[in-house]
């Protein structure tokens, strides 16, 4: 099993064989999580601190559950009551936590690159749970696992990513991962929600849902991130749904066995029809939630293995 990373900061730093290693190990954790006894000792004796500078009940709960099932001591840092709110810088917080000798830091931050900066200042492994518009690596990995289990492979597929591309770190991480795994990627969005320069990733760009969905194996819908918008990016939610919301009529242009994905939380009736989101024959949205726990377990397990090996080499060096 190949995984060389010291931290997991983005998909851009992972090679295809490392991505496959994460997915293969995550597959075994899916099986574990379906048992009555869902416990592993992969992180026994290790401390995991979750630092979420943005609210995210779903992702934080997934990381917390993943750590506990691996046997870690898990602490959720209450950022709203922390010294950060009193004026302490992110680096000061990082140095303070580093002095407590944690083993894993799971960090979500509204500023792109903030997690990379923090990782450069601590001695433990750092896992990016989403930073600004930059990356959300575990979301892309769990999406890849969901696709692989549904389609039997994660190569040579046509994947349509639809919605608010401009503000989405999920879109960026998926675009990088799917490209590394030799898939054909289409981005579908109104011009106001299509970021400049995105075509450099080798994807196809569309502003027409029906044309973009034609022959797609996978349809991945994205939430309108109104909290990141500082202007009028769409005429109205009603008009947006009419042109870019996924319903049965538009999905008919994709392949007959195309799967429907959404990273959540969903705005039903805005980016996706509620009935379609709940269709067990097409939607794998709940599968994505399940795969999320398994993928995060795999990522933390692999990072912990590398951390233990690094500390072992350091101890041998001191003894020598």
UniProtKB/Swiss-Prot annotation:
Pathway: Pyrimidine metabolism; UMP biosynthesis via de novo pathway; (S)-dihydroorotate from bicarbonate: step 2/3. GO terms for biological process: 'de novo' pyrimidine nucleobase biosynthetic process; 'de novo' UMP biosynthetic process; amino acid metabolic process. Its EC number is 2.1.3.2. Carbamoyl phosphate binds at residues 58-59, 108, 136, 139, 264-265. One of its GO terms (molecular function) is aspartate carbamoyltransferase activity. Pfam families: OTCace, OTCace_N. It is an enzyme of class 2 (transferase). L-aspartate binds at residues 86, 169, 223. It catalyses: carbamoyl phosphate + L-aspartate = N-carbamoyl-L-aspartate + phosphate + H(+). Keywords: Pyrimidine biosynthesis, Transferase. One of its GO terms (cellular component) is cytosol. Heterododecamer (2C3:3R2) of six catalytic PyrB chains organized as two trimers (C3), and six regulatory PyrI chains organized as three dimers (R2). Belongs to the aspartate/ornithine carbamoyltransferase superfamily. ATCase family. Catalyzes the condensation of carbamoyl phosphate and aspartate to form carbamoyl aspartate and inorganic phosphate, the committed step in the de novo pyrimidine nucleotide biosynthesis pathway. This is Aspartate carbamoyltransferase catalytic subunit. It comes from Cereibacter sphaeroides (strain ATCC 17023 / DSM 158 / JCM 6121 / CCUG 31486 / LMG 2827 / NBRC 12203 / NCIMB 8253 / ATH 2.4.1.) (Rhodobacter sphaeroides).
